[in-house]
């Protein structure tokens, strides 16, 4: 299963501090039983949530785990979260989040139904099954940044800002 959290903050003067906090947050999240990987991205496309984190999880039971409940959330950042961009969705359709290297981009397209092709790219379609369910389906694709095609304005382009972290990461 895939858990995707999208957000942004209202005080952009604190963006560097937010970025540092998020690195530690991801490190903690991959210590939760049932979370095997986490990676954070920032939007290169205006009009979309500025920050996206993608997690590989074993099941929705992760969200009721006592340890998860003790470490989840935004902590001191909660009052600064821009609610226009705050979305948490749980998806089925993929066991592990795709790896996006530094020179790749994560493409995200929310749709009512899966589509065969968008921009000539092969998409993985995820079905929303829990939490906010802000979209029925989310298409994701990882492409080389150098080969990024022209895309519709309804497709978000995200660049990785952390490596994919896992229980085996340093």
What are these regions (language model features)?
Residues 1-170:
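Macromolecular interaction modules
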């Amino acid at each position: 299963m895939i858990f995707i959290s999208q957000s942004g903050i209202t005080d952009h003067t604190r963006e560097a501090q937010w970025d540092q906090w998020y690195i530690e947050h991801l490190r903690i999240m991959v210590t939760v039983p049932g979370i095997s990987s986490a990676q954070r991205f920032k939007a290169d496309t205006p009009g979309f949530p500025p920050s996206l984190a993608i997690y590989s999880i074993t099941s929705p039971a992760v969200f009721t785990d006592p340890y998860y409940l003790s470490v989840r959330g935004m902590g001191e950042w909660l009052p600064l979260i821009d609610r226009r961009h705050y979305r948490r969705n749980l998806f089925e359709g993929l066991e592990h989040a795709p790896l996006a290297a530094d020179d790749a981009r994560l493409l995200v397209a929310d749709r009512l139904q899966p589509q065969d092709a968008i921009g000539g790219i092969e998409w993985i379609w995820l079905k929303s099954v829990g939490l906010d369910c802000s979209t029925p389906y989310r298409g994701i694709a990882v492409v080389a940044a150098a080969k990024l095609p022209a895309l519709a304005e309804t497709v978000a382009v995200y660049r990785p800002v952390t490596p994919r972290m896992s229980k085996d990461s340093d």
